[in-house]
Design a protein with these regions (language model features):
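Cell-envelope and extracellular/periplasmic
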Residues: 1-194
């Protein structure tokens, strides 16, 4: 059943599905004017794990190629899937949409570089142990302070944190600080490349 609120945000609850895939899913939207359908062909049911955190969780397989070269020559596994949530800074509240397309990709030699290393080995172990599809939702940002993962209501218990974050309410100031941070992070990633 689907539930749609006054702002158009929606939630859908599915009956339990047998682990496996790929399945096809059709989503229909009916309005006074017409009915629209959207069909997805690449849908799997199984276990989904959130891989969240800082640099240790973010550390990509790309940087582990020298240590685990055989992982990059393994047979592709479309049932071990990864989705990297793009990093976007927003100091005005939670985001409900992405600015760019986001997709799930199966583990293969041409996609493995982007997988979180910890997530990949964990997911592969679960796949081998239970034989079900595994999805890894990668929500990571190296060097991010814990406060950046907390909502404003929680941070209210530490007024100093809210004071420190106040300059970021100005979009121009936030952009300048974020660009500087991203440049430093990019340099760090370049230094890691072997």
């Amino acid at each position: 059943d689907a539930i749609v609120d006054a702002d158009g945000a929606w939630t859908v609850t599915l009956e339990p599905l047998d682990a496996g895939g790929p399945y096809r899913m059709t989503v229909s939207e009916t309005s006074e004017a017409a009915t629209r359908e959207s069909l997805s062909h690449d849908v799997y049911a199984g276990e989904v794990f959130i891989c969240a955190g800082q640099s240790n969780m973010e550390y990509q397989m790309e940087f582990l190629h020298w240590r685990y070269p055989s992982e990059f020559t393994r047979e592709a596994d479309s049932l071990l899937r990864h989705c990297k949530v793009p990093v976007r800074f927003d100091f005005h509240g939670p985001r409900h949409e992405f600015d760019e397309p986001v997709q799930w990709v199966g583990a293969a030699s041409d996609t493995l570089d982007e997988f979180t290393g910890i997530g990949y080995f964990f997911g592969r172990m679960i796949r081998e142990s239970f034989g079900v599809p595994v999805g890894l939702l990668n929500i990571t940002l190296g060097g991010s302070p814990i406060e950046s993962w907390m909502d404003e209501e929680t941070l209210a218990a530490w007024p100093r944190m809210l004071t420190d974050l106040a300059p970021y309410r100005n979009d121009d100031e936030a952009r300048v600080r974020n660009e500087s941070s991203i440049e430093a992070r990019t340099r760090w990633h370049e230094d890691l490349r072997v």
